[in-house]
Amino acid sequence: MEPRPEFTVIAGPNGAGKSRLCPFYIRTASFDGDKLMLQLRKDHPEWPDRWISGSVVSELEKQKTKALTEKKDFAFETNFSSDMAVRMVHDFKESGFKTSLYYFGLSSEEDSVSRVIHRMQTGGHDVTDEVIRFNFREGLRNIQQNLRLFENITFIDGNSDYGHIVALHIEKGHIHEVEDNPPQWFVDQFENLFKELNTQSV
């Protein structure tokens, strides 16, 4: 039997290191909407924001449909702050894909804002404070509410230079591990939910 194709979500707040660190964890090239948006703004400075946003969504849907049709691995980088991101997980799961989550965590909205400011000062792309805070709150809420959709889950400390793994859950391998002294963001945001995953898989 051929292995199931895999849908991977690389999630976390702005500034958590998703783009920088995810290549160390997954082999599949990920769809990065922020990167495409920046390129479109550079190529088409005359376009209004709604055209650019629409083009990004259109390209994502195109690549998603291709992956579903061809049963090919697909990876998606996101703040997970939109209903569209949640629907994508359902769509791939219902099509028989293995679902995996790599979540890069930060402690607070302020931490996310400060890291984006630092990134911008070193040549990275900017995001408004309002968007950063929305993405932090809604992305966290959506992940917490939909954690059970994922068969494999890896929590990574966004404050670490090299993507330190905090917790790991692999459903079929019966692996459920948390490091001895996890960062406070994991304790506050996910510790109890993560324990429930282990109870359900027993």
Where would I find each of the regions flagged by the language model?
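NTP-dependent small-molecule kinase module
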Residues: 147-202
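Glycine-rich phosphate-binding loop used to anchor ATP phosphates in small-molecule kinases
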Residues: 52-106, 139
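The conserved Walker
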Residues: 13-14
